[in-house]
Structures are given as structure tokens and as C-alpha cells.
Amino acid sequence: MSFFKRLKDKFAKPDNEQQLKQDLQQDAVEHQEPERTQHTAPSETVHQDNDLTSVEDEFDDGLMSIEEFEELESQKIGAKFREGLEKSRENFQNQLNNLLAHYRKVDEDFFEALEEMLIQADVGFNTVMELVDELRMEAKRRNITETEDLREAIVEKIVEIYQQDDEKSEEMNIEDGRLNVILMVGVNGVGKTTTIGKLAHRYQAQGKKVMLAAGDTFRAGAIEQLEVWGQRVGVDVIRQGEGSDPAAVMYDAINAAKNKGVDILICDTAGRLQNKQNLMNELEKVKRVISRSVPDAPHEVLLALGATTGQNALAQAKAFKEVTDVTGIVLTKLDGTAKGGIVLAIRNELHIPVKYVGLGEKLDDLQPFNAESYVYGLFADMIEQNVPEVAENQPENEG
């Protein structure tokens, strides 16, 4: 099975397109409801439980198999990434189509033009060099002489480069039966607090008991902003006064989380990079307090980066990697950029997995990152247009 066909079969089913659109519209209505009031968590929880009961009943009644349910979920994810990456997709596909139309033959001029295109898309110099070198070898190995025949290989190599370190590294280190501590770091203005609120909503929807710790005690309004999110999604927020010691906030939060049987504690931190040494000392102090009370914690240190800042996001990631052990990236505002290639640069040059991406403003627009979902969103039109109809209707073994 071709790579394009596999992605199309997984993420896009034309015969289900209308139903999928209705499902997404219904999801949007449901997830916008909390914006009307700050106290909607109980009704949300009941609704989600009813959804789960409904799905279980469908399984029991034989109306929907687990495989069918998983297929529908994959299509929903594909639609989310397709919608959220619309700007990047239009940019990538238009430039690649123009490139393939201009350069018909596979030669060094074509590869140099491809390098320039990818660098302009924020893929990152080192990653681009590796990707294009791989394509040169692939073209030689398969004796490809027409650039059009490299279209699928380009997309496939992007996935391979992302997954070459560890295909499973994008999974969160969350375990049942323990207090899981997530430390959020990042500069001000990239959507760190919003990400915390959406993460809390996501885990609460999965049946987890969630608590937030307002550890950004220096930025004016940061504590109040986190409290608004806590009220909106229906979770407790542990706080002290503005200017207080962030480590003391963490100490109080961990004790409260243990007393209340919390599954996941998400901790906000200050987002200042003016003085790297001060930031390092502050984060180390916070981590010491956490690890004394919860062995091996924090279990995740997530760095929030704004996709719209382009290569500046890469510089921020490098700076934070120097001051603390970042375990994953949350790339926010990916829907607001036409240069979605920064995902590859972060993964390949810093060896930090992207664990979540922000694909819009709704609560459920924070999605777990997956390399195949990402490239589908980035090249969906190209993928669907370049799967031959004969491949849809004939068995794969037929000549």
C-alpha cells in the first residue's frame, strides 16, 4: 500500500465526510458552552459520561464495533489537523506544486530549490539538509528521473525524519495510581496559561482529577488568569499572593493534591528569560520542592512555544533546554502560521518531542501531536488528489 493511500484511508473517508462534518460541528458547540459561564464543569462531566455510556451501549448493541469507533476517531483527528493547518497547507502545497511544475527533471537545480523552499517554511537548515540528502539517495536508489514521482517520497521522508529517534516519545508520561506532576515553562505571551487550562479540560474529560498550581507569581494578572481557567473547566487552583515564592506555592499545591486524591497536578511557572541564571535557580528550586514530596517528579516538563514566532521559537527552546530538562513541547497557535515546518526543526535539531499542538481557540483544539496526523494536515489535498482511483477499487495484489 502506498504511503499516500495509507494516510488517506486512515484520516479521510469521502463517504463519511458529511457525518464527520456534523460530528465536528457538534463538538464545537459542546466545547464552546463553558465560555458562557465559569461554572459548567458538573454539566460537562455529566455530558461526557453520557457520551461514554452511549458509546458502550452501541458496542453492546452491536451498532458500532471498536474498529469502527477508532476509525471515526481517526477521521475526526484528521479533520482537526486539516482545519488547523490550513494556512500552512496552502503555503506548503502551493510552493511544492509550483516547484514540481517548474522543475520537471530530478537534478541538482531542483534539490537546491527544494532546500530553499523548506528553509523558508521554518523547517530549519540542518533538518532541510538531512531531508534533501535522503531524497537524493531515494531518487538514485529508485532511479527516479521525474520530479512528480518524488512527491510522495518528500512527504514520507518528513515523517521518517520526525520519528527517527523514538516513535513513541510523543506520548505523555502519565500513569494511573500516582500523583502525576506536569511543570509548564515558557516565555510570556505564547499561550502558556491557556494551554494549562486546555490540558486540564482534556484530562478531566478523560476522568482524571486535576488541580492547578499558580506558580507564576511575578507577572501581573497571571494568578487571576489561571483562576479564571480553573473556574471555566471546573478544577481547583492553589495560589498565594502576587510576588510570593513559587516554590512555596508548589509545596502547598502538592499537599492539597495528595489530600484530595488528585491524579494530575499542572504547575504554572514564571515566563521571564531576561536573566537566565535567575530563571535556572528558580526552576531548580521549584523542581527540588516537587521531587522531595513526589519521587521522580516532575514527570513532564512541557515548554510552551508559539508557532507564529518561527525561528525565534527554536531559539527559545534552546534557551530553556539549557536551564532545565524539557521533556516535551506544546506548540501553540499552529493554526495562525503559514510556516508549520518549525515542528520538524524542534524535533530534529533539539531532539525534543512535540507532545501537543494548538490548532484553534476552542477547548478541544489542543491535540496530541502525531507525525502522520501532522503531515496529513499539511498535505491533505495533495494526498487525496494523488491516490489513484484504481487503488481504491482493486485488490492490492492485482497487477
Language-model regions, residue ranges each:
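Non-catalytic terminal/linker segments enriched in charged/polar, low-complexity residues
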Residues: 1-160, 170, 177-178, 382-399
